[in-house]
Amino acid sequence: MRALLLAFQLLSVVAALTTVNCRLDLSPRQISRKDLLRTHLRLYQVGNFSGQPYSAKATLRDPEGRFRFEDLPVSHDENSTVYFQLVASSQDYNLKPNRVLIEVQGRGEGKEPTVRAFQNVFGREHFPSPEILYPEQLVELEAEPELVISYVHAAPMRNYIVSRRSGILDSGPLAGIFRSKYKMAAVVTIIALLLFPMLVEKFDPATVEAIKEQRLSQTREKYAAVGESNS
């Protein structure tokens, strides 16, 4: 008798399991082996539940990008609803949607549960119902025959190694001068004015002597004029 009861309970548990089929669409690109390794997919149970919550990870099964989450613990009782959160991420692409609320609703014994999907938003991962309107209503997605996840664009390059000490040309006053074309022009002008007399003296000493003589004569004339006015 106990064996029959145990077998009946086991069949009830098996009957209360379902599968969610999904697909990653990177068209027009083909999914490569690198995409298989650098794409992460996770599904976990949210909302009211008893016992251990469901949590599973999936990998891409084929070059078409198909993946699935199997043995989801759901109830076949009519009007019973179980919620799961699907999180998709990639090291190379920004995926859309990257958060999906999965709703599995029982339809009674002998009938497959109804699977619905809603595009979730950041900060609402643990809200167990799409009917919560704050801050916005969730957009329903096509879940049959499979939920499709695509990509927006390539993700920005990530700096896995960041130098703690940057050089003087990367930060500080000198970096500010090199980044601004106006400051750079002012510095070049000042340096040119400082170097001009030395360059002229080196390449044209006769002109330099003439300039010095002219300055000396102007100084003598100035002092001579001052002496005559005092006398």
From Swiss-Prot:
<feature type="glycosylation site" description="N-linked (GlcNAc...) asparagine">
    <location>
        <position position="79"/>
    </location>
</feature>
<keyword id="KW-0812">Transmembrane</keyword>
<keyword id="KW-0325">Glycoprotein</keyword>
<dbReference type="Pfam" id="PF17081">
    <property type="entry name" value="SOP4"/>
</dbReference>
<keyword id="KW-0732">Signal</keyword>
<feature type="signal peptide">
    <location>
        <begin position="1"/>
        <end position="16"/>
    </location>
</feature>
<keyword id="KW-1133">Transmembrane helix</keyword>
<keyword id="KW-0472">Membrane</keyword>
<feature type="topological domain" description="Lumenal">
    <location>
        <begin position="17"/>
        <end position="183"/>
    </location>
</feature>
<comment type="function">
    <text>Involved in the export of PMA1, possibly through the monitoring or assisting of PMA1 folding and acquisition of competence to enter vesicles.</text>
</comment>
<feature type="topological domain" description="Cytoplasmic">
    <location>
        <begin position="201"/>
        <end position="231"/>
    </location>
</feature>
<dbReference type="InterPro" id="IPR031395">
    <property type="entry name" value="Sop4"/>
</dbReference>
<keyword id="KW-0813">Transport</keyword>
<keyword id="KW-0653">Protein transport</keyword>
<comment type="similarity">
    <text>Belongs to the SOP4 family.</text>
</comment>
<dbReference type="GO" id="GO:0015031">
    <property type="term" value="P:protein transport"/>
</dbReference>
<feature type="glycosylation site" description="N-linked (GlcNAc...) asparagine">
    <location>
        <position position="48"/>
    </location>
</feature>
<protein>
    <recommendedName>
        <fullName>Protein SOP4</fullName>
    </recommendedName>
</protein>
<feature type="transmembrane region" description="Helical">
    <location>
        <begin position="184"/>
        <end position="200"/>
    </location>
</feature>
<keyword id="KW-0256">Endoplasmic reticulum</keyword>
<dbReference type="GO" id="GO:0005789">
    <property type="term" value="C:endoplasmic reticulum membrane"/>
</dbReference>
